[in-house]
Amino acid sequence: MPHSQTSAPRDSLAGVRLARGASPWLLPTVATAAVSLLRARRSGTAKAVAVPATALAAGMLWFFRDPEREITQGRVVSPADGVVQSIMPWKDGRTRVAIFMSPLNVHVNRAPLAGTVTSVEHVPGGFVPAFNKESENNERVVWHFDTELGDIEMIQIAGAVARRIVPYVPQGTKVEQGERVGLIRFGSRVDLYLPEGVEVDVEVGQKTVAGVTRIDRD
């Protein structure tokens, strides 16, 4: 049974469910496409603009999609759609699972466990491509959740194009597992730190679906 979502209403356009925070990018693109299509029959310039503008608008609609998910019942679920880029033991005994999100993935991130958001910290930084090691110094938002497994850290990392991270919930919010917590625009990465003793049940190269793919093993 999926968990209920109690977050504020998302942006919408023509019945398409869109990610919150999409409007500043999407509305001008769709408006340009609509105007150029209306004028295409009377203007050669508008006709020339209509095709790429419409293609760009369609791409934006696809990128900012925010599908409903039936949340998997398990201790830890993936916070992001994408591909597992690396699984690394950390000095403090935790395990870091890094998930790379391409521009083709859904970029709405979800809570890996139910709990309380104890910290949401924006850290300024660069914009190196998210698949590079140097991306660890990129602009990012660091989350901490108080859960049944203790403190869970999740980091949203901006990429070369993804220069805007949009948190959906503030510190102190109680979230359900799989609840939407934020958006990263245009290609990026999410790092999830599992506490010592939690065994990973995904492997490098494996595709993940936010709220659906189980990350840990019983």
Swiss-Prot record:
GO terms for cellular component: plasma membrane. InterPro entries: PS_Dcarbxylase, PSD-A. The keyword Cell membrane applies. It is found in: Cell membrane. Transmembrane segments: none annotated. The active site is at S188 (schiff-base intermediate with substrate). Keywords: Cell membrane, Decarboxylase, Lipid biosynthesis, Lipid metabolism, Lyase, Membrane, Phospholipid biosynthesis, Phospholipid metabolism, Pyruvate, Zymogen. It is a peripheral membrane protein. It catalyses: a 1,2-diacyl-sn-glycero-3-phospho-L-serine + H(+) = a 1,2-diacyl-sn-glycero-3-phosphoethanolamine + CO2. The record marks G187, S188 as: Cleavage (non-hydrolytic). The modification Pyruvic acid (Ser) is found at S188. GO terms for biological process: phosphatidylethanolamine biosynthetic process. The keyword Cytoplasm does not apply. Its cofactor is pyruvate. This is Phosphatidylserine decarboxylase proenzyme.
